[in-house]
Amino acid sequence: MTSGEGANSGADPEGFGSSAIDDAARLDAALPDIDWTVPPPGAAASVFRAPSGDLSMLTIGDPGDTRVVLVPGVTGSKEDFTLMLPGLAAAGYHVQTFDLAGQYESAAAGPHNLRPPRPHYDYDLFVRDLIAVLEAGQAPAHVLGYSFAASVAQLAYAERPELFASLTFLSAPPQPGQAFRGVSRIGRLSWLASGRVGAALMIWGIKCNFVKVSPGRLRFVNIRFASTRFESVRDIIALMKRTPDLRRELAASAIPKLVAVGEHDLWPLRLHSGFAREIGAQLAVYRAGHSPCETSPHQLNRDLLALFSRAG
């Protein structure tokens, strides 16, 4: 399914996304269960010294190629893009992804490392870290922000647009302000939960495997939670209740933009479609939930490569 500014939100049977059955969709339908702790062949692990501390990073591809930076969301990590990395590198891109401060193998990074120290993880911390990553390599780069990280990418773009060749928002909050208000079924009650309560509920739900991920994925998720700092999840949930409104700035931008979502995402498709229309972005929808990078990686790569080609 595709849409752009002024387009309708109906499925396009000739387009891509949930309506398309092609080689990418067939590859995704045959995905095996994997050990998510093992990096894909050719990927190198490293540590990036960011303003908030040491960030754990994976890199794949030729450093001379155009750069792609994939940024995971809350309770996530660089491993969420494991199935995407080889395909993007094979297509001729230098791909980097890193754990956010406080998350998984970047757990030691955080506001306590800033000068002066700060009591909470805030938008400025995550934006400074992302800008530092972008400044440290070839720019402009194609940037994908997953869920909460989409807001971070938007803020970084508003401050340093010259660092961005394109923007992709994967399963991103489609509304500014209290982002959880639009979540299907429970959104109208979300204002009752504090950051601490919201974080605890999110972690509990993921550990209980209500979305029925594979055994290998569930094992990795539990390993990751053992390292992730609860305070980082708590603070990010609180930040998502103050999602910035950058729709005007994004709509005025000439760089290619993509809103990529699963048809069973946390937020209803009509909100994602409206967000894409408001900012002049293409919309791609997959037969997936909140994590197309895990369940539809070949289709997502296909659409990213089409987006990148529009950047020249």
Over which residues does each language-model region extend?
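Active-site loop/oxyanion-hole signature of alpha/beta-hydrolase fold enzymes
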Residues: 48, 96-144
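Conserved HGGG/HGGXW glycine-rich cap/lid loop of the alpha/beta-hydrolase fold
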Residues: 53-112
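Gly/Ala-rich beta-loop-alpha elbow adjacent to hydrolase catalytic centers
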Residues: 145-149, 153
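Flexible "cap/lid" loop of the alpha/beta hydrolase fold
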Residues: 154, 158, 164-195
